[in-house]
Amino acid sequence: MESIEQQLTELRTTLRHHEYLYHVMDAPEIPDVEYDRLMRELRELETKHPELITPDSPTQRVGAAPLAAFSQIRHEVPMLSLDNVFDEESFLAFNKRVQDRLKSNEKVTWCCELKLDGLAVSILYENGVLVSAATRGDGTTGEDITSNVRTIRAIPLKLHGENIPARLEVRGEVFLPQAGFEKINEDARRTGGKVFANPRNAAAGSLRQLDPRITAKRPLTFFCYGVGVLEGGELPDTHLGRLLQFKQWGLPVSDRVTLCESAEEVLAFYHKVEEDRPTLGFDIDGVVIKVNSLAQQERLGFVARAPRWAVAFKFPAQEQMTFVRDVEFQVGRTGAITPVARLEPVHVAGVLVSNATLHNADEIERLGLRIGDKVVIRRAGDVIPQVVNVVLSERPEDTREVVFPTHCPVCGSDVERVEGEAVARCTGGLICGAQRKESLKHFVSRRAMDVDGMGDKIIDQLVEKEYVHTPADLFKLTAGKLTGLERMGPKSAQNVVNALEKAKETTFARFLYALGIREVGEATAAGLAAYFGTLEALEAASIEELQKVPDVGIVVASHVHNFFAEESNRNVISELLAEGVHWPAPIVINAEEIDSPFAGKTVVLTGSLSQMSRDDAKARLVELGAKVAGSVSKKTDLVIAGEAAGSKLAKAQELGIEVIDEAEMLRLLGS
């Protein structure tokens, strides 16, 4: 007679097998009623023997207790976004850039997938068992949605098959099929619940429930499309090969993934999917095109927040007609005056649209737009509403001309438009309340000074009450003054003060980015910080010297030079330093002169570090003249292997590359 343990093992194995056939292979062998019977049998046995329940049991998909709030998970490998193209010409230009950058006649094949309109998630398996899941968030840090993801039947709690890596992070999209979306809304209308505008909102709302039991009732599904962390195992050296391997391990992959041998085949795939879009049964907003070879991907690399080897080819946006009620003007962080059309509300691609950007005065002139006109609205990229054209044949008699302001609508300062630029700007600088608000919001944002708890509404109140005029004023705030703001109690106020104190310790690159210099994003700020090393050197740099920094041209160099030439900006920086803002003193990075065992070497980190974070380790290595790479190749000089080091360590040993452990790294860093 079988033991209880054997019965449980057999039932779990059988149920996982049928889940795989149903969700991955789309070839069920048994009817739903038989699956339900097996599940009931397993649940009854586990109820009688709770000490034998395992976390990966199919019964454990049922939602756990509600959470008070989501905790955060930091992505070990950032979840990058993709650049978009919207027409064949742009795609062909992307194709040419890839071919040119590879600088060879070697063949490029493309792996083409559906661009699902859902929520990007990261799922981590350790020894084949699902241990955590997170949203994309800002690409660096996401929300912990492990309990909710465990309720999604399409996602295996345990992988099956051979050669499963010790740690495998799968990336993919959670989405809601059209039938499930309609059922949810039908139930909501009947019970007076929330009706969702589109399947994507419904999927996001379902996945971000604090109560996993609610998520468990929603018919969410999942397709995987990539990998993040990979340790203690190997994967095929092509993107398609990896997807097929995922499928063998029980992970769902779209059956529309196609390998294309040329740009012409990619375009044919795009048009075929566009034609089939209405019959897919779920929402997509384009196709994703990736270089199939992992070796070629590595050579192409990344730019800022996106890979050079992939692009999202978006479908034409959906359009609707409505009327322009008025045109108002918004003022941005750099003083840019942006006209915004206030519309008669209309549903476009499932979203109620009441505003649309008009970009600038040239765009208004190009459109020939007047207030009161009937216009065609498009959600560009299915996200940002914009006015496509005016329906002149239906222009009402009482339309009014759009008059672009000569003075800032917020502070009254002169509006100027530099020759050769399309954007008109307020000249008020920080005396302009709108610019001040947006500049401060940028200054405290996560990727800048990262002041936790300092949200937009707090900044708005601080500016309106004239508590804060410059970024330096933020560090003069007291808990008592903050308590006077709306919805700000003593505890919350003290938390903000503590966060401001913590934010004083930053990096030179973050500080530069936080200053909000025109055209200086994160990548440029990092480049400037690495090249000049000190604030004094950067402030004294000429336009010619600035252009020696990689990817800095005449326009960016001029903006940086002009920013530091402005006395008011230098005063703000001095005030910030006086308030205690600081960063580690730079170590001169000169591979020929620096006395460091890492100087001039290409270093790869793998495995988990116990004494410092990987980010901190990378920063120290760079300070000491190393170039930190993400993968092992013949050009790698040194591999630092932490706990549970995987395929990178194996490859280093195969290539005969020097390998040291964390203890040796710390010793060398100290020397």
UniProtKB/Swiss-Prot annotation:
InterPro entries: BRCT_dom (IPR001357), BRCT_dom_sf (IPR036420), DisA/LigA_HHH (IPR041663), DNA_ligase (IPR001679), DNA_ligase_AS (IPR018239), DNA_ligase_CS (IPR033136), DNAligase_adenylation (IPR013839), DNAligase_N (IPR013840)
Claim: Membrane is one of the keywords in the record: no
Annotated BRCT domain residues: 593-671
Active-site residues annotated for this sequence: K115 (n6-amp-lysine intermediate)
Cysteines paired by S-S bonds: none
Listed Gene3D superfamilies: 5' to 3' exonuclease, C-terminal subdomain, 6.20.10.30, BRCT domain, DNA ligase/mRNA capping enzyme, Helix hairpin bin, Nucleic acid-binding proteins
Keyword terms: DNA damage, DNA repair, DNA replication, Ligase, Magnesium, Manganese, Metal-binding, NAD, Zinc
A GO MF term: DNA ligase (NAD+) activity
Reactions the enzyme catalyzes: NAD(+) + (deoxyribonucleotide)n-3'-hydroxyl + 5'-phospho-(deoxyribonucleotide)m = (deoxyribonucleotide)n+m + AMP + beta-nicotinamide D-nucleotide
BP-aspect Gene Ontology terms: DNA repair; DNA replication
Record: residues binding NAD(+): D32, V33, E34, Y35, D36, S81, L82, E113, R136, E173, K290, K314
Binding site for Zn(2+): C408, C411, C426, C432
Family to which this protein belongs: Belongs to the NAD-dependent DNA ligase family. LigA subfamily.
UniProt name for this protein: DNA ligase
Gene transcribed to yield this protein: ligA
